[in-house]
């Protein structure tokens, strides 16, 4: 199927590695020019940009001024901007129960995930006011759908993205851009640098127990779902939806068998 992305332009945040890098490569393979956002890994972003004929743009999306400037910079470099993928985020690897969760970590996690996504979305919505159309894809997580013990900060941020933020955005954006769409991709456990060292044999058995497909996702699995939602042809009448890429996951296995 032709996704209608040839000749379009997209911005992918958090694209210097992992899922973001796979998203950028997938969109480029469909013919889009891609602005590859990075916060600190400039070398990886520039290498990827060279590989896919894209552009690398650095910004700290927790900083309002830098986030506001990112979309105009992408438009300046690409000449247009049809899609924006708000992928940047951080999963804190250390398990900390809520009763012991420091306020500093709570704030840090929400800033890196929810605030960064809000600022990216706000900047893109300001852009589509002048174009009347576009696709915004927010990357959330199954942690935001089912909760995640030991990572309540991350789960809360991703739940806010997938529900309150996305649903408000899809209703607001059409007031100024009649053909703009907002959707969410919610990956489950995915093989990526962020989960490196976490997916032990024991963990794999535990996390796949509620998945009919009994496997974790690849970054490319997530990227293809994003490309579908970014498509003006395949998903041109799709807005306000959450596409879960988690092998049919139905929830959490809270207790070990037996």
Show the residue positions of the predicted features.
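Substrate-binding pocket helix/loop in short-chain dehydrogenase/reductase
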Residues: 94-98, 102-110, 207
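A short, exposed helix-loop element centered on a Lys and neighboring polar residues
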Residues: 121-122, 167
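Conserved glycine-rich cofactor-binding loop
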Residues: 9, 16-17
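Residue(s) in the substrate-gating loop at a strand-loop-helix junction
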Residues: 141
